[in-house]
Design a protein with these regions (language model features):
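Basic, helix-initiating cap at the start of DNA-binding domains
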Residues: 1-19, 23, 32, 36
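Cytosolic nucleotide-binding catalytic cores of signal-transduction proteins
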Residues: 6, 20-24, 47, 119-121, ...
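Short amphipathic alpha-helical segment with a characteristic S/N-K-E followed by hydrophobic residues
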Residues: 12, 27, 50-55
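Amphipathic alpha-helical linker/stalk segments
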Residues: 18, 22, 28, 60-82
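Short hydrophobic/aromatic patch on the recognition helix
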Residues: 38-48
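Helical hydrophobic small-molecule/effector-binding pocket
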Residues: 75-114, 128
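Amphipathic alpha-helical packing segments from all-alpha helical-bundle domains
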Residues: 102-136, 166-170
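Hydrophobic alpha-helical segments that form the core
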Residues: 128-168
């Protein structure tokens, strides 16, 4: 059962993303968001400190859905499949990446890449530098892909990353 506050957060985040498709992020007001979401103005303040926090919430939800849907755990036996699954998820949600890029907020995605890999490093009690390397590389490939018009397929992106990682980074 979904709590009302969870539903309100989702409605607020969806409203902000919808507004970003039509209006510059800096020009969107809290009133615009609550009007679009059909919620009272106070609801936004109960749930978020600012618009950046709304974006972070939205991205957290997308990341959580990827983690749940991927069902492929990162390990040395299926790393390539995991990366391909990640790029498929990113391609499926590329409109969000494009919106964040246009609003100069794509850096928030770096935090999500870190969350995926750094949590794994902590759980496994291993050196985090390896996971920061993976996270940074994946983020920068995604950033470059968004910046250049999303021309490659998820499989091409995964192959580029895996080829570089296997031939250069894992030695």
């Amino acid at each position: 059962m979904e709590l009302q506050s969870d539903r309100s957060k989702k409605d607020i985040a969806d409203a902000l993303i919808s507004l970003m498709k039509k209006k510059n992020f800096d020009k969107i007001t809290n009133k615009d968001i609550t009007d679009r979401a059909g919620l009272s103005h106070i609801t936004i303040y109960r749930n978020f400190k600012n618009k950046d926090e709304i974006i972070k919430y939205y991205l957290d939800e997308l990341t959580d859905s990827f983690i749940k849907e991927s069902k492929i755990l990162y390990d040395s036996n299926n790393f390539s499949s995991y990366i391909e699954k990640l790029f498929n998820h990113l391609e499926k949600n590329k409109d969000i990446g494009v919106l964040l890029y246009k609003a100069n907020m794509i850096h928030h995605l770096k935090d999500e890449f870190d969350r995926i890999f750094i949590n794994k490093a902590q759980k496994e009690n291993v050196e985090p530098y390896h996971y920061y390397f993976l996270s940074g590389g994946l983020y920068n490939i995604y950033y470059f892909w968004i910046k250049n018009g999303c021309k490659e397929t998820p499989i091409e992106l995964a192959n580029k990353f895996n080829n570089f990682y296997i031939t250069k980074g894992s030695k």
